[in-house]
Swiss-Prot record:
InterPro entries: NO_sig/Golgi_transp_ligand-bd (IPR024096), V4R (IPR004096). This is Uncharacterized protein MJ0745. It comes from the Archaea. Belongs to the M.jannaschii MJ0150/MJ0739/MJ0745/MJ1460/MJ1642 family.
Length: 181
């Protein structure tokens, strides 16, 4: 494996995401990388005139990518799913339209029902996968978020698997939702 250090001072976010998506990339100096990421994003957003209630998407993507790399090193991708699951439960949507609205309002993509039996949700224009290229699905957080949200909607335990991912070159991200029996 090759070691590579990313310095954001000389790179734009698109190049940062491209480097991050390389399969052999290892974070060798986490604190410096995190500081460079935060400083880049502070500079980018300091002139913003609107107050943002949520974390800027670029910052969220960078945080999740860093978490993905560290979690993958530990062979534990389930952790991002668990974090998303708890967040989805925290949202506590009462119906599908609440979840769809959440995705739209937070620029996560356009959530649609692709099929009903089995239940497959489609996220078009997934903002997280934009500019990324991976060999495997990467939306563990989103899968967990959908699982937690759908448990609130259906009042039954569910499991969600990402079956297609834009980061793999698919047209959208697809999530299969199954009730646990």
């Amino acid at each position: 494996m090759k070691n590579m250090r990313v310095e954001l001072k000389t790179k734009d976010m698109k190049e940062f995401y491209k480097i991050f998506s390389e399969s052999e990339f290892i974070i060798t100096d986490d604190s410096k990388l995190i500081n460079e990421t935060v400083n880049y994003l502070k500079k980018k957003y300091k002139n913003s005139t609107t107050k943002k209630k949520l974390i800027p998407l670029d910052l969220f993507k960078a945080i999740v990518l860093i978490m993905m790399k560290k979690i993958k090193e530990l062979d534990s991708e389930i952790t991002l799913y668990d974090i998303g699951y708890e967040f989805g439960k925290h949202l506590n949507p009462k119906r599908y339209s609440d979840l769809k609205k959440f995705f739209k309002e937070n620029n996560l993509g356009t959530l649609k029902v692709d099929s009903r039996k089995p239940l497959v949700l489609k996220v078009e224009n997934c903002s997280f996968c934009e500019d990324l290229s991976f060999e495997e699905p990467i939306c563990y957080f989103d899968a967990g978020l959908i699982a937690g949200a759908y448990e609130c909607i259906l009042k039954k335990p569910v499991v969600v698997d990402e079956i297609k991912c834009m980061a793999r070159g698919d047209d959208a991200c697809y999530f299969k939702v199954e009730v646990v029996k």
